[in-house]
Amino acid sequence: MKFLLTRLIFVIVLTSTSKIGLSHEYWIDPVNYYLKNDEKLVAGIFIGDNFEGSQIAFSKKYFKNSNLFSNNKKIKIRGRLGDFPALNIKETFEGINIIQIESEVNYIHYKNLSKFEVFSSNKGYKNLADKHREKNYPENFVESYKRYAKSLISVENIDGNDVDTNMELELIFLDNPLKNSKKRKR
């Protein structure tokens, strides 16, 4: 988390859309984690690997379910197709604000095992394609997946805690990471 809090600028790597589809990391990169009451919450959304990737514009494909949580309030995050950076939120609340984003279901069509073999090997599963063949699974198959992302931002103060936003897959901070961060920017 410290890495995410202190790294405010990511290099945008131009990649093809097929590369974005094969990338499995999805993250929110706020311009500032510490806002004043009158500041707009601006954040880029990235897809890539090892925190290097492409910044994407607002699209319903990537924002099927997106909300801002704070002080027992939940507000639907709205955007316009093509907004870049993707998040430009005017309405925030004093204390901890939690951005939660869930994509729609996406699909990767594997026509043969070569791309799957490269991907699974890069993720540390060198024998997975061989096991796939041994089990006589089809070489032409479809993978379905959703992407989930969450970020905490403070407005005016760092009071508050992370909450369960009811995503299918979610990490919840037991301690407030913004209180524990040694470097705060305003």
Regions from the language model: what does each represent?
Residues 22-186:
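N-terminal soluble domains immediately following signal/targeting peptides that reside
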Residues 2-11:
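Sec-dependent signal peptide recognition
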